[in-house]
Swiss-Prot record:
Catalyzed reactions per annotation: isopentenyl diphosphate + 2 oxidized [2Fe-2S]-[ferredoxin] + H2O = (2E)-4-hydroxy-3-methylbut-2-enyl diphosphate + 2 reduced [2Fe-2S]-[ferredoxin] + 2 H(+); dimethylallyl diphosphate + 2 oxidized [2Fe-2S]-[ferredoxin] + H2O = (2E)-4-hydroxy-3-methylbut-2-enyl diphosphate + 2 reduced [2Fe-2S]-[ferredoxin] + 2 H(+)
Name used for this protein in its record: 4-hydroxy-3-methylbut-2-enyl diphosphate reductase
Any one GO molecular function term: 4-hydroxy-3-methylbut-2-enyl diphosphate reductase activity
Domain of life: Bacteria
Pathway(s) where this gene product acts: Isoprenoid biosynthesis; dimethylallyl diphosphate biosynthesis; dimethylallyl diphosphate from (2E)-4-hydroxy-3-methylbutenyl diphosphate: step 1/1; Isoprenoid biosynthesis; isopentenyl diphosphate biosynthesis via DXP pathway; isopentenyl diphosphate from 1-deoxy-D-xylulose 5-phosphate: step 6/6
InterPro entries named in the record: LytB/IspH
GO-annotated biological processes: dimethylallyl diphosphate biosynthetic process; isopentenyl diphosphate biosynthetic process, methylerythritol 4-phosphate pathway; terpenoid biosynthetic process
EC category: oxidoreductase
Lineage, broadest ranks: Bacteria, Pseudomonadati, Chlorobiota, Chlorobiia, Chlorobiales
Matches recorded under PANTHER family: 4-HYDROXY-3-METHYLBUT-2-ENYL DIPHOSPHATE REDUCTASE
Active site: 127
Known function: Catalyzes the conversion of 1-hydroxy-2-methyl-2-(E)-butenyl 4-diphosphate (HMBPP) into a mixture of isopentenyl diphosphate (IPP) and dimethylallyl diphosphate (DMAPP). Acts in the terminal step of the DOXP/MEP pathway for isoprenoid precursor biosynthesis.
Amino acid sequence: MNINLDRTSSGFCIGVQGTIYAAEEKLQQEGGLYSFGDIVHNEVEVKRLEALGLVTVDERAFRELRDAHVLIRAHGEPPSTYRIARENNLTVTDTTCPVVSRLQRTTRLLFELGYQIIIYGKQSHPEVIGINGQCNNQAVIIKHADLSDPDELKGLDLAKKSALISQTTMDVPGFYELKALLEARFAQYLSSEKSAWMAIRDIDITAAMTGVLSMPSLLFKDTICRQVSSRNQKLHDFSLANDVVIFVAGKKSSNGQVLYHICKEANPRSYFIEEIEEIEERWLRNSDGRAVATVGVCGATSTPMWHLEKVALHLEKNFAQ
């Protein structure tokens, strides 16, 4: 049995790398640091950092902190978080991912221009909470690209000029499926010549803010992180190339769920684990009881490479022949 570790399309993305590096640096300097929410959606990595002095706090505990040092994670935060930090004299280490920061700015400016904000994303995801905060928590948030959940559409006003954006870790095909269905729905309400949606760039928004450009009433901006989405095809191919795939990610990881689904579609013998102890020997054997020839180990953008290496080493020591 050969164990193949994916080093090209697994492991921390740049945004998470920056957050972890900043946390380690602050912990080394000060010996302690608060993180507002899980620093990354990976319990194994959270435990490692907590052993170094990181303390994770929820919203209630965050509001009660005074004169402390707090880290803002890569997911970003709404304006209200920074207001509380100022009021409570908190020192903030802001590690919001640059891609997320640009998305927050886009959302804020479009809202100021009078657009109804539609977010393709998960309502409870920290990144979406931060984005929604840029538009006074008035965004219409849609998780199901096929519009199969009517509750998600209750706040949608077809009479308003609207802009569609996305949580950075959602899937590209889903975004464009949602865009097409929204176009059709708005077309039923508006005249056909007014229902065309225009793709916009940051420069277009800036021009509109200064009055140089007049934008149409229906817009969309594909804000999905390409560093994340580019992994999709690579993981698909990696899964096809191995008899069995062990996908390693935190159970809370949104990106992990998306990438695991891609692996599972490519190779039905793909298995999701968070901890090494979850691996079952029967996964690694064929129906005749013989060991499979190849096992691939891969993971999400929130999975540390050290943990992937640990899983691969465990497989080599205990199952490889």
